[in-house]
Amino acid sequence: MSEKIVLIDGHSILNRAFYGIPELTNSEGLHTNAVYGFLNILFKILDEEKAQYLAVAFDLKAPTFRHKMYAEYKGTRKAMPEELREQVPVMKEVLTAMGVPLLMKEGYEADDLLGTAAKKSEEAGVDAVIVSGDRDLLQLATEKIMIRMPKTKRGVTEIENYHAQDVKDAYQVTPSQIIELKALMGDASDNIPGVPGIGEKTATNLIAAYGTIENAYAHVEEIKPNRAKEALKNHYDMAKMSKELATICLEAPLTLSFEDARLTNLYTPEAYEWCRKLNFKKLLGRFEEVEAGKPAEPEVTMVTDFAEAENLFSRLKNQKQIAFELYHEDGLHVSLTDSEQEVFCVSEEGFL
């Protein structure tokens, strides 16, 4: 069975959680509903996926290469509500307290970092699960890359899952052709213009018939209806630019390694303190369950004379299995055990 990495679209999931969960504040008046919803989605995904690696990508305020290509890119988006904006740095702090690596790169969007990380994982034989509410990411779906799209209503989260065939079933085009659709129909949320007069239905029919905008343009005289033919003839340059804007970069300068992203213990004392400060009482129970399930630290017994050593060796010689470790640290030492409850340490001091 392949290893797996979970890659989360930070702003997208925060945004979904903010609008899906009623307003919450902590005792200090800080809004917390987006952070609370994000963590619930995170834990739900991790419980289901049993992944070995995790990373979260966030957008930065700086313009990206797409803004340089088209100044009006995302120009129609409304400003983020202040109640959500104040939760973004808190979310990053909580994730950092959990030891989760954050992916951010000036000049690139979170989508580009997620796409690059997912493709690198696929090439390394690691399955990737991308969690986002952004349908642009469907272009990345393969048999090794799954897109999971949470929807939270009244505090209840449901998740749609997409591998390559699921995209085809839902949209009648392949994942890579999602880009072609955007090139023709545009994307109002990102202010990608597309071709004026071509909507989703016509775009789907054209891509189903011709595969790409380039091939559609090569056969433009065959296109029906006439309105779509004239629109593509007159605005093909706009279609080409829109395609570039819609294409996720798979070669972003990302330095994340699998070791950086390896999942260890999210339930750290620092993360517990954040959840306590944010009044996330239900989530605190997760920390307590993890602590309760941890094995007790073994008792360490120092063996300091021959009599104790003889008793130890007499006990261990009858065991089917023992573990030992030989190490140098201020002298020569050997640790021996036949259980998880007790470890015996024998040092050269007193014997040599």
Task: Give the residues covered by each predicted segment.
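Non-catalytic nucleic-acid-binding/docking modules located in mid-to-C-terminal regions
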Residues: S2, K50-A55, V100, E123, ...
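Long, highly charged low-complexity segments
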Residues: S257-L352
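Short alpha-helical segments and helix-capping/turn motifs at coil-helix boundaries
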Residues: F38-K44, G115-A117, E230, A309-E310, ...
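Flexible loop/turn segments at secondary-structure boundaries
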Residues: T64, P225, D330-G331
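A residue-level signal for conserved active-site and pocket-lining positions in enzyme catalytic cores
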Residues: D9, V56, L114, D134, ...
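Noncatalytic, basic helical substrate-engagement surface that gates or grips nucleic-acid strands
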Residues: M1-V131, R135-N161, M238-T255, D260
